Amino acid sequence: MSNILEVKDVVKQDGDYTALNSVSLQVPKGSIYGLLGPNGAGKTSLIRIINQITMPDSGEVILDGEKLAPNHVSVIGYMPEERGLYKTMKVGEQALYLAQLKGMSKADAQKQLKYWFEKFEIEGWWNKKIQELSKGMAQKIQFIVTILHQPKLLILDEPFSGFDPVNANLIKDEIIELNKKGTSVIFSTHRMESVEEMCDYIALIHKSNKLIEGKLEDVKRQ
């Protein structure tokens, strides 16, 4: 099986602190890949490098056979743990703006937004400001914006924090459905039960190092 993502010997220093210590990963195409570890282990540092928010001090990242480059922003969907929506902008206006940053035309973005707003039964939110929404409502908008441009690789950092159980299950179902249609998923969490429920591959990150990587059932046997 070919890989959607390869991380090769990535090192990231933050002053005297080593955030990532020569970390290598292989994420198979079409997988749901769990990045498991406690808070502060280095998971978010790695995700920020994959998303080109920060650069590694050494090592490289290969996306779908190509060295990671600025144009790859259009094929990655990233939902950070700290959600980044502008609180005073209207929901619809903001969603259109973020979709166009990912390379979508306004017409395509409007069509996709109509589909997702109807699917999530939130058509009435279009003209609301983000600050008027509950945390769970804002999470739904962030998820829609993350997947709107139909990315090849979906990266979710603690995606269920802030959701009640009903909406968490709704988002889980959508992630699984997107994966069935061919989207590769990296799912970062500190919760083993979430990984066991959704993932077929896993890497355990601890104290800036990768401890283990492989198929979920193989890792559980070790």
Question: What does each model-identified segment do?
Answer:
Residues M1-N3:
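Primarily ABC-family ATPase nucleotide-binding module
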Residues L5, K12-V23, V27-H206, L211-I212:
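ABC transporter nucleotide-binding domains
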Residues E217-R221:
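Short acidic-hydrophobic catalytic motif
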